[in-house]
Amino acid sequence: MGKVYDWFEERLEIQAIADDVTSKYVPPHVNIFYCLGGITLTCFLVQVATGFAMTFYYRPTVTEAFASVQYLMTDVNFGWLIRSVHRWSASMMVLMMILHVFRVYLTGGFKKPRELTWVTGVILAVLTVSFGVTGYSLPWDQVGYWAVKIVTGVPEAIPVIGSPLVELLRGSVSVGQSTLTRFYSLHTFVLPLLTAVFMLMHFLMIRKQGISGPL
């Protein structure tokens, strides 16, 4: 093992990276509330793991979606647990995100020179809410269907572009298979990818600028 480690160390300088990560200065005013962002990240990782597991059984069609969720909950080993953890961590992620935003705002963490960190955080907050909206519809039960119908119908009040925007969101004039396909694609591919990119940017900026000082 020593030779293998030395081979990688010679090329990647792993020890220098580890020293940089473990020796970062932590201000004395930091308390447990500064962990809310990290908890949000942890919830996101749980979401990715449990969501990936559920894709093996979920079928994104209007005729099979609900039945596939029922099958996952009743017939798949620990399927009920996987879906329950996914739902619980989703709620926890939203709660931790909201608390994190309040903590950053109340402690002035959005001020110069951390404006871009704040902007990426706001984008991540929007993405988090979007996860909830798109994921809520995937079981395609009565609650999910009508939630999608209401949410996608909101932009119709916008002058000129309202109706085309609604049709873009739904994939057609009415809510149906195209809508479910769009929401499934957003929930399982587009939103996770965007979230991962903005989280990386967010943490790199925090790493570069450090934790903001006390008010």
UniProtKB/Swiss-Prot annotation:
Tagged with keyword Nucleotide-binding: no
Localisation: Plastid, Chloroplast thylakoid membrane
Residues given in the record as heme b 2 binding sites: H86, H187
Binding site for heme c: C35
Cofactor note: Binds 2 heme b groups non-covalently with two histidine residues as axial ligands. Binds one heme group covalently by a single cysteine link with no axial amino acid ligand. This heme was named heme ci.
InterPro entries xref list: Cyt_b/b6_N (IPR005797), Cyt_B6_PetB (IPR023530), Cytb/b6-like_sf (IPR027387), Cytochrome_b_N_euk/bac (IPR048259), Di-haem_cyt_TM (IPR016174)
Cofactor(s) listed: heme b; heme c
Top-rank taxon: Eukaryota
Membrane-topology annotation of the record: Multi-pass membrane protein
Chain residues that bind heme b 1: H100, H202
Pfam families named among the record's database cross-references: Cytochrome_B
Residue ranges of the TM segments: 32-52, 90-110, 116-136, 186-206
GO-annotated molecular function: electron transporter, transferring electrons within cytochrome b6/f complex of photosystem II activity; metal ion binding; oxidoreductase activity
GO BP annotations, alphabetical order: photosynthesis; respiratory electron transport chain
Key words of the record: Chloroplast, Electron transport, Heme, Iron, Membrane, Metal-binding, Photosynthesis, Plastid, Thylakoid, Transmembrane, Transmembrane helix, Transport
GO cellular component: chloroplast thylakoid membrane
Assembly with partners or alone: The 4 large subunits of the cytochrome b6-f complex are cytochrome b6, subunit IV (17 kDa polypeptide, PetD), cytochrome f and the Rieske protein, while the 4 small subunits are PetG, PetL, PetM and PetN. The complex functions as a dimer.
Other notes: Heme 1 (or BH or b566) is high-potential and absorbs at about 566 nm, and heme 2 (or BL or b562) is low-potential and absorbs at about 562 nm.
Functional description taken from the UniProt entry: Component of the cytochrome b6-f complex, which mediates electron transfer between photosystem II (PSII) and photosystem I (PSI), cyclic electron flow around PSI, and state transitions.
NCBIfam families hit by this protein: PRK03735.1 (NF002990)
Classification via HAMAP family: Cytb6_f_cytb6
Family according to the record: Belongs to the cytochrome b family. PetB subfamily.
Protein name per the record: Cytochrome b6
Organism field: Klebsormidium bilatum (Filamentous green alga)
Lineage: Eukaryota, Viridiplantae, Streptophyta, Klebsormidiophyceae, Klebsormidiales
